[in-house]
C-alpha cells in the first residue's frame, strides 16, 4: 500500500514538473512558454551557413597544400567526413 502511494506521488511530482513551464491552447496543444511560433527561433541563415562552410573548405585546402600543416590533416578529414584530396581550388571546381 505504501509503495502504491509513493509511486503515485512520484508520478504526480514528475508530471507537475514537466508541465509547469508549459501552457495549453486549445488549437495548438501544449507549448513551452505562453505562445508558440511556427518558425524556429534560432537558426542559421542559408547564406551565412554557405559562407562558413566555404571558409572551412578553403582553409582545409590551404592546409592540405601546405607541407608544414601535415599533422592536422587527419583530424580535419575525420571532422568533415569526406575525401579532402583537392587537386584544384574550390572556386575552380564550379
Curated annotation (Swiss-Prot):
It is found in: Secreted. InterPro entries: AKH/RPCH_hormone (IPR010475). The keyword Transport does not apply. Keywords: Cleavage on pair of basic residues, Neuropeptide, Secreted, Signal. It comes from the Eukaryota. It holds the Pfam family Adipokin_hormo. Residues 1-21 form the signal peptide. The keyword Secreted applies. GO terms for cellular component: extracellular region. Neuropeptide involved in reproduction. May be an important hormone in the regulation of gonadal maturation. This is Prepro-gonadotropin-releasing hormone-like protein.
Amino acid at each position: 500500500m505504501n509503495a502504491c502511494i509513493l509511486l503515485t506521488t512520484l508520478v504526480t511530482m514528475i508530471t507537475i514538473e514537466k508541465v509547469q513551464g508549459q501552457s495549453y491552447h486549445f488549437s495548438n496543444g501544449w507549448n513551452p512558454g505562453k505562445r508558440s511560433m511556427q518558425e524556429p527561433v534560432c537558426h542559421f541563415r542559408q547564406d551565412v551557413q554557405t559562407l562558413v562552410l566555404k571558409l572551412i573548405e578553403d582553409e582545409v585546402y590551404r592546409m592540405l597544400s601546405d607541407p608544414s600543416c601535415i599533422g592536422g590533416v587527419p583530424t580535419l578529414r575525420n571532422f568533415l567526413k569526406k575525401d579532402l584530396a583537392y587537386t584544384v581550388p574550390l572556386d575552380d571546381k564550379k
